[in-house]
Regions:
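SAM-dependent transferase fold signal centered on methyltransferase-like domains
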Residues: 1-372
Length: 372
């Protein structure tokens, strides 16, 4: 079937498509992801004018890579599925775009050639491709992870195997996935003396997406590793505590309630997950013509204002724990501000927020309003 995206026309797998194997994948629900990719590339081009080449490492029908090519990037698309390669070539010709489409496994292609920007968008975990990407990506590494159950701790053993970390399925499980992924990528980069700086990261609709600026220097890799640490989480009162460093120092009892049902997670990325100035630059490069323009701008505005502290709270989950009705989020955050704490909405859902207050301090600051 034919679809239009970003002003281009593509043939993609569908019931009405003839001659296209079912193994070639196209997900219309990922249009926000692709729109943000284009806007991010536009912002990054301004940040680093020397970046020119872009690898779409798992191209499938070619939509993401061809949209980058339409913006002037020197694009290589590769896929190990021959039917996908054929379809990507047809779509390039259909849109009169000069793109190098190669029939190759992503790891093989990355070991063969270096690129300024590398985009990993696999089905499932990106970690089997991370080492090759860090070895051959010069500037910007774009990564999608769709295996959110392992990342967030719902499929614990799979998460440990894939990411070399202990994930926990908490009430802030989307952010757990974000920070487990960033930790694994930072550790992978460090093996190549590459440091990572997350410019934009979000958890949306059952996937995590991050854009990492790379610096090839041992001291940069060391600095990234210093952003790693562990987390202690109390299952009884939802208190959590973050500890920097690769050697965990777990709590024996909860400082807030005295409980002993504590979960430990890590290593996690405890540093910032976004650069607010870059996020604003991406937002400014979303045109009205994008189908997801309003949704994308709303997401980016929330990310720009989101506090850089780990980890978020869910207001409704806290109120349920306390046996109190939830009030308007703006009023809730205002109470925290009046009590002297920093607080912001978080992008994970409409009821999530971030603050530098502990769970006990949150309750003390908001209890009067919640009880009215």
């Amino acid at each position: 079937m034919r679809v239009t995206e970003g002003g281009l026309e593509f043939e993609v797998p569908g019931e009405s498509t003839r001659g296209v194997e079912a193994s070639v994948f196209y997900n219309p629900r990922q249009e926000l992801n692709r729109d943000l990719t284009v806007a991010t590339l536009r912002a990054y081009e301004r940040r680093n004018p020397h970046a020119e080449s872009y690898l779409d490492a798992m191209t499938a029908s070619g939509v993401r890579g061809l949209r980058a090519a339409a913006d002037g990037w020197a694009v290589t698309c590769c896929d190990r599925d021959e039917a996908a390669v054929d379809l990507a070539r047809e779509n390039a010709a259909r849109n009169d775009l000069e793109v190098d489409v190669r029939h190759a496994d992503a790891n093989v292609e990355l070991h063969r050639s270096a690129y300024d920007v590398v985009d990993l968008d696999p089905f499932g975990t990106p970690m089997p491709f991370a080492d090759a990407a860090f070895a051959r990506c010069r500037n910007l590494l774009c990564v999608t992870a769709t295996d959110t159950a392992p990342l967030c701790g719902a499929h614990f053993n799979s998460g440990v195997r894939s990411y070399g970390a202990v994930p926990r399925n908490t009430d802030y499980h989307p952010e757990m996935g974000v920070r487990i992924l960033l930790s694994a990528l930072a550790r992978s980069g460090a093996r190549f003396d590459v440091g990572v700086q997350p410019l934009l990261t979000h958890a949306s609709s059952h996937y995590v997406r991050t854009y990492l600026e790379l610096e090839r220097k041992p001291t940069a890799a060391d600095a990234a590793l210093e952003e790693l640490g562990s987390l202690s989480h109390c299952e009884d009162c939802l208190y959590r505590e973050h500890h920097r460093g690769l050697i965990a120092d777990p709590l024996e009892t909860c400082p807030n309630c005295g409980g002993e049902r504590l979960l430990e997670a890590g290593p996690l990325w405890l540093g910032p997950t976004c650069d607010p100035a870059f996020v604003a630059a991406v937002r400014d490069r979303i045109p009205d013509e994008f189908a997801t323009a309003n949704k994308g701008r709303e997401l980016l505005e929330t990310l720009e204002a989101e506090l850089a502290v780990p980890t978020h709270y869910d207001q409704h989950r806290l109120c349920k724990e306390w046996g109190l009705p939830a009030n308007a989020m703006d009023d809730f955050l205002a109470d925290l501000g009046e009590a002297g704490y920093d607080a912001s909405r978080a992008h994970y859902s409409g009821t999530t927020f971030k603050t530098d207050a502990t769970v006990g301090e949150i309750r003390a600051a908001t209890a009067e309003s919640l009880s009215d």
